[in-house]
């Protein structure tokens, strides 16, 4: 009989991953009326032994035991309150039943044979090689016709996985969860599951399968005990015990927030202002940083903000340091008002400087080129000013030429003067009367 065979081979129950969820009653194909009265008690005793053995037999896993590593005990997770997990492209309950996942609603019964652990710290079953999920970037998408014949097959490895994939350490406290989840995400990426992990924008490259979800659930439960999880993680898991992907998505978002906090502190500590930008722009930049830190429960006092701003002032704004050095009650709004006042004064001065310089230069040019002036020095200086851009050789040539020309003109003027005087004397002699010669 079948029950007697089970009694004779009790180890056959351990060969299946679903031994812990089989029925407690062993059906028999034999007609009970055909059994003699003498054999009925023995049949009952055998059935009782088999049933008692089933009750005492612990649930086994399809992952072979590794004597070099002790796997942490899975934490107790509360049962789901909002029904089955239907997100992220998971299998429907009908498909799960058809795939022998009969106990989809019970987290303790989510057996996942070769997905249970990482290949780095458990030796996988040679009959069930660990599949990899990330195809190479150069490979084309598979033919949809061939997908129908691949439901019953075990996925083959598409890319290599390093042999040094290390498991994440076990979570030890609620405060260390943000650090622990970084190692857990790195562990999933090294296990070729990085394309189902949300990126910085909360986006994923593809939908995960039910087996991948079971693998993520089991490893998360094994290394993160429920009583050590933060409150916000417990709230998510109490609504849906298996929604690990939402936990990872919010964890990535919180990482980005922490990185932004660090960037804001660095920007606030390195503030610099010299008036090259408008005072309004500087005030908006500083106020935005302070408000962003305040939203993350980090309050920056006015005194601290004023000290950081004063440290970065330069140029005409530098004297504000001495003004605020002895002040104990610093107001950020007052400091911004004084910076704005100095900026406006400098702006007005810069607008008036070009017009004053233009009027003064025009007045100088008119005085130098006035036709009524008799000052030759001004004209000569203006002449040399126009040729100031010429090289020294050209200047020397011009000076020599001008001196030679002036010397020739002077000689010509002297000769003309002498000749005119001589002619005048001759005229005077010719006009004298003859009586005067005697």
Curated annotation (Swiss-Prot):
InterPro entries: TYA
GO molecular function annotations of the record: RNA binding
One Pfam match: TYA
Biased composition (Low complexity): 369-381
Protein localization: Cytoplasm
Site feature Cleavage, where: 397-398
UniProt keyword Cytoplasm, yes or no: yes
Region ranges (Disordered): 1-86, 360-403, 418-438
GO cellular component: cytoplasm
Region: RNA-binding, residue numbers: 295-397
Keywords: Cytoplasm, RNA-binding, Transposable element
Biased composition (Polar residues): 1-11, 19-39, 49-60
Annotated function: Capsid protein (CA) is the structural component of the virus-like particle (VLP), forming the shell that encapsulates the retrotransposons dimeric RNA genome. The particles are assembled from trimer-clustered units and there are holes in the capsid shells that allow for the diffusion of macromolecules. CA also has nucleocapsid-like chaperone activity, promoting primer tRNA(i)-Met annealing to the multipartite primer-binding site (PBS), dimerization of Ty2 RNA and initiation of reverse transcription.
Miscellaneous comment text of the record: Retrotransposons are mobile genetic entities that are able to replicate via an RNA intermediate and a reverse transcription step. In contrast to retroviruses, retrotransposons are non-infectious, lack an envelope and remain intracellular. Ty2 retrotransposons belong to the copia elements (pseudoviridae).
Assembly, per entry: Homotrimer.
UniProt remark on domains: The C-terminal RNA-binding region of CA is sufficient for all its nucleocapsid-like chaperone activities.
Record-given protein name: Transposon Ty2-GR1 Gag polyprotein
Source organism (scientific name): Saccharomyces cerevisiae (strain ATCC 204508 / S288c)
Taxonomy of the source species: Eukaryota, Fungi, Dikarya, Ascomycota, Saccharomycotina
